[in-house]
UniProtKB/Swiss-Prot annotation:
UniProt pathway: Amino-acid biosynthesis; L-histidine biosynthesis; L-histidine from 5-phospho-alpha-D-ribose 1-diphosphate: step 5/9
Pfam families assigned to the protein according to its UniProt record, in alphabetical order: GATase (PF00117)
PANTHER family cross-referenced by the UniProt entry: IMIDAZOLE GLYCEROL PHOSPHATE SYNTHASE SUBUNIT HISH (PTHR42701:SF1)
InterPro entries linked: Class_I_gatase-like, GATASE, Imidazole-glycPsynth_HisH
UniProt keyword terms in alphabetical order: Amino-acid biosynthesis, Cytoplasm, Glutamine amidotransferase, Histidine biosynthesis, Hydrolase, Lyase
Gene3D superfamilies to which the protein is assigned, alphabetical: 3.40.50.880
GO biological process: L-histidine biosynthetic process
Designated name of the protein: Imidazole glycerol phosphate synthase subunit HisH 3
Organism, as annotated: Vibrio vulnificus (strain YJ016)
EC number(s) per entry: 4.3.2.10, 3.5.1.2
Limits of the Glutamine amidotransferase type-1 domain: 1-206
Keyword Magnesium: no
Primary location class: cytoplasm
HAMAP family listed in its UniProt record: HisH
Amino acid sequence: MITIVDYGLGNIKAFANLYKKLNIELVFASDVNDLANATKIILPGVGAFDHAMQMLNDSGMRETLDELVLEKKVPVIGICVGMQMMADSSEEGQLKGLGWIPGTVKKFKRESQALESQYPLPHMGWNSLEIARTSELLLGLDEQKLFYFLHSYYYEPNDKEHVVATANYGFEYACIVNKDNVYGIQCHPEKSHHNGVALLKSFASL
């Protein structure tokens, strides 16, 4: 059962509609009891890192999620801020992250006014992926590999082996990461048309 963590943040209805079109069942989890039958987990997220972490901590689901992901090895995918929450920490806030894939969330820095003008923040719009290594998550993507982005911070994993794909916005940064059963994507698959559907369908098939 694909379960999306409903802790008050993220466009969960968009994922429900997308999976409904694929005839794949998806359920919402707003407490630990709803996680009991999870065989795959989606962790969405929008907004500020600390707010998202506090909302998840307050939901009462964090310990159960740690158990499912780290001990029972249930596949999980974090999306946008949901991916950033998988890091150890973020320059945006003070709270600790989940630490599922060691790394730090950093803010895009602009060393000159020209760069700031060319690459304004937030990074908003379409960008293509550069594949760093093969992954089942990437099956079915088209040749251009365009995805929709909206963010001002990026995830820098400690181990480059965890980088699946990168994007370029003034410099190359990780936009898809993976360690064992843990996946994270910075872009918004629910807004990325064919490629977003293909990626979420591939996650359902893991």
